Amino acid sequence: MKISVVCGSRANNKELLLQFLKSLDYQIFKDFDVNIVCDRKFTESEEETFMKFFNDQDLEIINRTYFFTNNNSDFNPNHLWWASYVRNFWISKAQWEFIQLFDDDNTVNPKFLEDCLNKWEIFTHINNCDCVILPSLYYRNTNQIQNQWFSYFNYWQSRPVLHLLHWKDQWQVEMFSGNGIFSKASTLKKAKYDEQIARISEDLDYTLSLYEQWVQLWVFSDLKVVHHERDKNKLEQAWIWSYLQAKQKAKNWFLFTKKHWNKRQLLQFYFCWLPWCIVWLSFKAIIYWWLKWFDIIKWLFSWIREWWILIHKNEVYTS
């Protein structure tokens, strides 16, 4: 059994990417290669300098790492769809039986790949169906779980049934992560990242799409991915720091809801969740950026109104 470890990178922080590769170099399980998609437009001289930095490292893993760039592959550096395009590209390039998805700001312990493979074998055999192994995502070197969106016991957002190892795990793993997904290549290729849900919640949408293909989602508290996220202020974390972020956030709310939720959840979204989110984000804007809070709230309401009209008319545009 061989694993394709795939990762997207802006390729603008070589030390961060090197840290990620070092954590892979220490893996006990060795039958894998690494595909890194460089999400930027390299000139030939820039690419040469970039590659020299990694080739000069005394790491065995470099011999099993392939960097996809705009110069050596059909990758389009002028794409409009951010992470979704990059992730579809890297999944399409994976060659082996299993795929492990990472971001370049992740690190893992030496047993991570071995544990993922073992858990996949056990739970696929027990349930006799396709399954996806999902880790716990930790913020830097802390005990703060940073997984995305879902609470296991929150009906409003817990659309997928998360299959947990033990009932106590629901208190340890409150949410699941799009970082660190592991499964067979044939399973992960059953769905694609939605290139309209491009920058916010694209991992969540992808995992939900797998679930809708009758794939079981297994979350493990003992599978730990460390997320070395750059420093962000509160409004960047909420994705309302700029006009374009507010636009994409409002768009994704409606796209995601229309795509995945049932009628009961749709009513909860419109009458409970959406109003609460608007109030909460407006409060954040006033507290954390009082000089520009009015503009932020105006952006939110403007785009919520526009996406409501367009999506309900099935006229979603991509500009």
Where are these regions (language model features)?
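Short, acidic, metal-binding catalytic loop of nucleotide-sugar glycosyltransferases
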Residues: 22-31
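A short, conserved alpha-helix in the catalytic core of glycosyltransferases
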Residues: 175-183, 187-191, 197-223
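Glycine-rich, basic loop-to-helix element that forms the pyrophosphate-binding segment
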Residues: 72-94
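Non-catalytic, C-terminal membrane-associated alpha-helical segments of glycosyltransferases
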Residues: 243-252, 263-319
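Short aromatic/hydrophobic "clamp" motif used to bind/position activated sugar donors
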Residues: 99
